[in-house]
């Protein structure tokens, strides 16, 4: 089983601040996907196949990485970006998720 470790577990950013969330895999994976979850809702696909934005995701989000190291970046934090973000990989037949990164708005 491939273990995904996210960093940081919790972070806070001010409006306009750049935010980077990292996801480290215990062994190499071909693709990494990211989900956004807001309170009381199910996780939504956010970034797929490393860097492709899901429909409706703002262009301030981007994804990058390869091998065992991947990241999600927000170029300029907005209030609506406060959420929990999960990385996810599929190494047939097992799907594994990171424990999540809680992103809060720093006021």
From Swiss-Prot:
Start and end residues of each stretch annotated as Framework-4: 97-106
Tell me a GO biological process for this protein. Answer: immune response
Its cellular-component GO annotations read: immunoglobulin complex
Something else known: The two sequences are identical. These chains were isolated from myeloma proteins that bind galactan.
Q: Which PANTHER family match?
A: IMMUNOGLOBULIN LIGHT CHAIN (PTHR23267)
This protein is called: Ig kappa chain V-VI region TEPC 601/TEPC 191
Chain spans, region Complementarity-determining-1: 24-33
Q: What is the lineage of its organism?
A: Eukaryota, Metazoa, Chordata, Craniata, Vertebrata
Annotated region (Framework-1), positions in chain:
1-23
Record keywords, A-Z: Adaptive immunity, Disulfide bond, Immunity, Immunoglobulin
Q: Which is an annotated Pfam family here?
A: V-set
Residues annotated as region Complementarity-determining-3? 88-96
- Family annotation (InterPro entries): Ig-like_dom, Ig-like_dom_sf, Ig-like_fold, Ig_sub, Ig_V-set, IgV_Light_Chain
Q: Where is this region: Complementarity-determining-2?
A: 49-55
**Which residue stretches belong to region Framework-3?**
56-87
Disulfide cross-links? 23-87
Region Framework-2, as annotated, extends over 34-48
Instruction: Note the superkingdom of the native organism.
Output: Eukaryota
List the Gene3D superfamilies hit by this protein, alphabetically: Immunoglobulins
């Amino acid at each position: 089983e491939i273990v995904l470790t996210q960093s940081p577990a919790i972070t806070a950013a001010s409006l306009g601040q750049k935010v980077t969330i990292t996801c480290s895999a215990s062994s190499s994976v071909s693709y990494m996907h990211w989900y956004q979850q807001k309170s009381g809702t199910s996780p939504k696909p956010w970034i797929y196949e490393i860097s492709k934005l899901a429909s409706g995701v703002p262009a301030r989000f981007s994804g990058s990485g390869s091998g065992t190291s991947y990241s999600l970046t927000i170029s300029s934090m907005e209030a609506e970006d406060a959420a929990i973000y999960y990385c996810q990989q599929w190494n047939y037949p097992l799907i594994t998720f990171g424990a999540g990164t809680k992103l809060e708005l720093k006021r």
